[in-house]
A protein has these predicted regions:
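Solvent-exposed, charged/polar functional surfaces in cytosolic regulatory/catalytic domains
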Residues: 23, 52, 82
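Condensing-enzyme catalytic core mediating Claisen C-C bond formation in acyl metabolism
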Residues: 1-38, 139-173
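Active-site pocket-shaping loop/turn-to-helix segments
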Residues: 28-48, 71, 95-102, 142-144
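Residues within alpha-helical segments
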Residues: 43, 47-50, 108, 112
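Acyl-thioester C-C bond-transforming condensing/cleaving domain
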Residues: 55-59, 73-173
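Phosphate/pyrophosphate-binding loops at sites that engage ATP/ADP/AMP, CoA/4′-phosphopantetheine
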Residues: 49-63
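A structural motif shared across PLP-dependent enzymes of the aminotransferase-like
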Residues: 12-19, 44, 71-81
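Short glycine-rich or small-residue beta-strand-to-loop segments that form or flank ligand, phosphate
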Residues: 64-70
Length: 173
């Protein structure tokens, strides 16, 4: 994973919005948010998450990369092509999904379909968003809910069945 560099705790928003202490955590279970600094973007967080995953597992022979974002810096091309341009996956197919909350589930369905049909063996899903760059500072309904961050998930074929492995990098406390 990769997270926005600025840590914003609930007490900051509760003070700003004149809310009672503990309101955000009590209603949402969220204790803090990670906000991208000025030099961080959806694309840079995606590439950082990819690098962090590559430090944990080999990303050789990736044949399909799916990117998911709702907040890419440019209207086009898709985040997937920014990843393709800035990484080394010469034989991979790339597709970009413009999706929010359901995006990871949509990407999992595409990954499963590609693997089940034997079209792909190693699929990389990269999700990345920087909602703080779009949500107004005074938006009391949405601002407490969203952090900026990215994840990179490797899905691959395994002849023995399903295996879930957990490799986490740059984990926030």
């Amino acid at each position: 994973i990769a997270l926005g560099e600025i840590e914003e705790k609930n007490d900051h928003l509760e003070h700003q919005f004149k809310w009672p202490e503990g309101k955000i955590s009590d209603k949402t279970g969220i204790n803090k948010r990670y906000i991208a600094n000025d030099s961080q973007s959806t694309e840079s967080l995606a590439l950082e998450a990819l690098e962090n995953l590559n430090n944990e597992v080999s990303l050789d022979k990736i044949d399909f990369i799916i990117s998911v974002t709702n907040t890419q810096t440019n209207i086009f091309p898709a985040l997937a092509y920014s990843i393709q341009t800035n990484s080394k996956f010469p034989n991979a197919q790339f597709i970009g999904l413009n999706a929010g909350c359901s995006g990871f589930a949509d990407a999992l369905l595409l990954a499963y379909s590609g693997i089940a049909s034997k079209l792909h063996k190693r699929v990389l899903i990269i999700t990345s968003d920087t909602y703080s760059k779009f949500i107004k500072d005074d938006d009391q309904s949405i601002r407490p809910l969203f952090s900026d961050g990215a994840s990179a998930t490797l899905i691959e074929f395994n002849e023995e069945g399903y295996v879930l492995e957990n490799f986490i990098s740059n984990v926030a406390p």
